[in-house]
UniProtKB/Swiss-Prot annotation:
One of its GO terms (molecular function) is 5S rRNA binding. Belongs to the universal ribosomal protein uL18 family. This is Large ribosomal subunit protein uL18. The keyword Transferase does not apply. CDD domains: Ribosomal_L18_L5e (cd00432). Part of the 50S ribosomal subunit; part of the 5S rRNA/L5/L18/L25 subcomplex. Contacts the 5S and 23S rRNAs. GO terms for cellular component: cytosolic large ribosomal subunit. HAMAP family: Ribosomal_uL18_B.
């Protein structure tokens, strides 16, 4: 009998493997991405203190009118722009990008490109 592979378990293993190497500091915090079927979430985290400095998602009130559906590339672009503007307002210009075990493609790539265009450096 062939068992179906659980893609989320594989993603979590990849994420843990990468997290052993990537840490965020106060000078260069970690930008973590989580992707669900209907939404996308981003947090900028200082791992030394364990605090979330900035967060944004497709569920934010600022994006309610702009985004009709939260699970597509256009919504990811808007979230990338929003998180970059929030981070720059708090004085964060450089981050370490943590793709969360996801392949750098599609929504993850669009979010990263939009954040770079809006002024974040990674």
């Amino acid at each position: 009998m062939i068992n179906k592979t659980n893609r989320n378990k594989i993603r979590l293993r990849k994420h843990l493997r990468v997290r052993k190497k990537i840490t965020g500091t106060a000078e260069r915090p970690r930008m973590n991405v989580f992707r669900s079927l209907n939404n996308i979430y981003v947090q900028i985290i200082d791992d030394t203190t364990g605090n979330t400095l900035v967060s944004a998602s497709t569920l934010d009130a600022a994006l309610k009118g702009k985004v009709a559906k939260g699970g597509n590339k256009e919504a990811a672009k808007e979230v990338g722009k929003l998180v970059a503007s929030k981070a720059i307002d708090k004085g964060i210009k450089k981050v370490v990008f943590d793709r969360g075990g996801y392949i750098y493609h599609g929504r993850i790539k669009e979010l990263a490109d939009a954040a770079r265009e809006a002024g974040l450096d990674f």
